[in-house]
Amino acid sequence: MPSFLRGILRPKERHHENKNHSQMSSDSLTSSYPTSPPKLEKTEAGSIISSTTQKKTSHHANLTITTKTEQSQRRPKIIDQVRRVESLGEQVSQKQRHMLESLINKVYTGPLGEELVQTLYLRIWAMKETPESTKILQMREDIRDQYLRMKTERWLRTLIRGKKTKLRDFQKRYEEVHPYLMMERVEQIIMEEAWKLAAHIVQE
């Protein structure tokens, strides 16, 4: 074949070969990486997301219902316990007040009161003389007894103040009035006797 024909034919052959090669490469790439239509992917993804969201929402709703049910079951028990404790506190406080009033009534009317005023009279008579002790010893007996009962009642109400009183409460109140008692020996004697009468109430 003449050389000039070879020069003409070779570019055409190369162009044809390149075209075939590029087509084959394209086909091989297409066959190697199969893809789905974009719309189908989006649709499938959307359905998957929607399904997952529904599952999560349903699960969350179930948890919420369960939690509310548990809370509703617990709440009555907690409320009952609180009410029971409060009612016990009220009962104890009422009992203590009732015991206090009953004790004061005995101080004025019963044999306990008679024994109390005799004890106070003897202790005041035996103590070192003070203006207050002298005044009490010079009183007429019935007036003196009533006076000592009233003093005792005042100390009882000071020691037992309505609400539940414990031993530490009495100790605190005693510390508050201690300086006064050191100057008023008669008051200290009456307070001590009042405490002896009220000790069983404080310990309830």
Curated annotation (Swiss-Prot):
Listed Polar residues bias regions: 60-70
Biased composition (Basic and acidic residues): 10-20
Stretch list, region Disordered: 1-75
Annotated keywords: Host-virus interaction, Inhibition of host innate immune response by virus, Inhibition of host interferon signaling pathway by virus, Inhibition of host STAT1 by virus, Inhibition of host STAT2 by virus, Interferon antiviral system evasion, Viral immunoevasion
Any one Pfam family match given in the protein's UniProt record, by short name: Paramyxo_C
Low complexity composition bias: residue spans: 25-34
One BP term from GO: symbiont-mediated suppression of host type I interferon-mediated signaling pathway
Family: Belongs to the respirovirus protein C family.
Protein name: Protein C
Classification lineage: Viruses, Riboviria, Orthornavirae, Negarnaviricota, Haploviricotina
Gene responsible for this protein: P/V/C
